[in-house]
């Protein structure tokens, strides 16, 4: 299955058989607990795009920038939040913030922060007993997301240049 592929890929990439994998893909987010190299449990957000690469892409398009630009710009922002977890409503909030003259970096921060909070909440529901956290999927290439997840979860979230491809290994 897709879950097993992501787990085996992460075990190979990180050379660790006990971990919690946070996979943020384009269409879904998966939290996969691996013990002794095998999937113990998993949770998947596949009902909506909130907390996924698609969410980031839609919000970046609303700000007329690329997703990777938004991730980097988010480092410079602060002080703004997006309260809605629904992509459609969050986009309305972003448009409203633009209309209010809010700085792009603060809006970018709010978008990335909403992804981080949603994913961290999923990870905390899944497992509090973690020996290692790693980030896979396309959004692992946004170093600010792994840094923000590290801060939010209180434990280092590791990435690797090959993390994006964990499900394909």
What do these predicted regions represent?
Residues 7-13, 53-57, 158-169:
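Glycine-rich phosphate-binding/hydrolytic loop that grips phosphoryl groups
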Residues 23-28, 137-139:
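A short acidic Gly-Thr/Ser loop motif
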């Amino acid at each position: 299955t897709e879950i097993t592929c992501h787990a085996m890929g992460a075990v190979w990439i990180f050379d660790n058989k006990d971990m919690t994998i946070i996979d943020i893909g384009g269409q879904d987010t998966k939290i996969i607990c691996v013990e002794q190299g095998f999937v113990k449990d998993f949770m998947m957000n596949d009902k909506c795009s909130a907390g996924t690469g698609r969410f980031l892409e839609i919000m970046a398009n609303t700000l007329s920038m690329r997703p990777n630009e938004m991730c980097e710009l988010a480092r410079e922002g602060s002080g703004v939040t997006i309260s809605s977890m629904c992509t459609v409503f969050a986009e309305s909030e972003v448009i409203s913030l633009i209309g209010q003259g809010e700085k792009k970096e603060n809006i970018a921060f709010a978008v990335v922060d909403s992804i981080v909070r949603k994913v961290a909440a999923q990870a905390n529901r899944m497992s509090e007993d973690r020996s290692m956290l790693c980030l896979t999927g396309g959004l692992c290439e946004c170093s600010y997301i792994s840094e923000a997840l590290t801060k939010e979860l209180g434990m280092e979230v590791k990435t690797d240049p090959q993390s994006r491809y964990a499900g394909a290994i």
